[in-house]
């Protein structure tokens, strides 16, 4: 975005009067902001009994106040500071785990709670007086932690994708971090469920396990498929990569598959090229063998839906929304404001306008 700077020349009018002096106008000092990215060194909560409690953390040696009611962006959900202290298996309402210290996320946490891999924090806020106060923050093991490769095989018993080069040796083991079983086996049924951290799970509502068009995908419970992840949703050949899920083709290059049900997910299959994001998780504590607990998987497949048929899906890669806002009064008018917006994404039904 082009930045413009306007220089304003001010003319000072000096008024002399008996017994009175007028000072020159002074601009108000703006509140300084900050943005930090670094490892989570310390994390604390003020009141374990308050689900919306305030807290504090240390990042890059800087102590930051986490105000009450702050929602923290995780890979697939939003949590409060108090939620971070419910452990790897926080449960769900009304049977939530009791919050207790430490969180197991900070480098200062002592064994056996010390994380084997440090967590990364992004935080933005304001400096009020002598205090850094967070306004937005996110936690991930690594913000840009991604991998890619071909699905060489699928271990249905443990819900694991074995990923590597096509025709080459196996290199990565990827499991969906899925406590509820939205995209396949729930974590407790995978044999390593207690080792996954539900705080970093995949979003169960807005599907992050998708084709390139945004069609939701899954790992079947068995090689025969299941009712929520039927094999027929990959076309007649069982591993088609570009087709229309429905009776009417959306494009000649994406043939219609009437048996495909757009309200169901499409199974990931051997031979699919995928990219994935997640966190390194020890399969056997202390043994140094890791797998990826994925919160997002994107398959290089083009699965569409019939024109005008519901449901249709949208995948948004980037959204820039201008909020306009009230203009600053002079002389503080160096403001870039716009009401325009930009979306970059894909849809299963490009005929819709």
Which sequence ranges carry the predicted segments?
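Bacterial N-terminal signal peptides that target proteins for export
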Residues: 1-11
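Bacterial N-terminal signal peptides
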Residues: 10-19
């Amino acid at each position: 975005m082009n930045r413009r700077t306007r220089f304003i020349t001010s003319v000072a009018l000096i008024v002399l009067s008996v017994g009175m002096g007028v000072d020159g106008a002074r601009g108000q000092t703006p509140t300084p902001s900050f943005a930090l990215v670094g490892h989570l060194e310390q994390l604390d909560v003020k009141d374990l009994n308050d689900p919306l409690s305030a807290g504090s953390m240390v990042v890059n040696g800087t102590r930051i106040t986490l105000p009450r009611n702050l929602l923290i962006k995780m890979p697939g959900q939003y949590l409060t500071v108090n939620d971070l202290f419910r452990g790897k298996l926080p449960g769900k309402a009304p049977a939530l785990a009791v919050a207790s210290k430490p969180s197991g996320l900070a480098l200062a946490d002592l064994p056996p709670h010390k994380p084997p891999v440090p967590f990364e924090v992004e935080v933005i806020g304001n400096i009020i007086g002598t205090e850094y106060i967070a306004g937005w923050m996110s936690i991930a093991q690594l913000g840009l932690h991604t991998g890619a490769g071909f699905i060489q095989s699928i271990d249905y018993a443990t819900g694991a994708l074995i990923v590597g080069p096509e025709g080459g040796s196996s290199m990565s083991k990827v499991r969906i971090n899925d406590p509820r079983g939205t995209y396949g086996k729930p974590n407790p049924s995978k044999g390593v469920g207690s080792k996954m951290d539900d705080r970093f799970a995949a979003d169960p509502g807005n599907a992050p396990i998708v084709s390139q068009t945004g069609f939701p995908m899954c790992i079947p419970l068995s090689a025969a498929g299941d009712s929520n992840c039927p094999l027929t949703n990959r076309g007649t050949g069982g591993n088609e990569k570009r087709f229309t899920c429905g009776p009417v083709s959306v494009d000649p290059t994406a043939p219609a598959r009437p048996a495909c049900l757009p309200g169901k997910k499409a199974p990931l299959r051997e031979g699919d090229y995928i990219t994935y994001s997640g966190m390194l998780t020890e399969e056997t504590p202390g043994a140094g063998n890791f797998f990826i607990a994925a919160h997002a998987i994107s398959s290089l497949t083009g699965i569409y839906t019939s024109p005008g048929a519901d449901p249709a899906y949208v995948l948004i890669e980037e959204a820039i929304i201008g909020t306009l806002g009230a203009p600053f009064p002079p002389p503080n008018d160096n403001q870039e404001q716009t009401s325009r917006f930009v979306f970059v994404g894909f849809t299963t039904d490009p005929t819709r306008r």
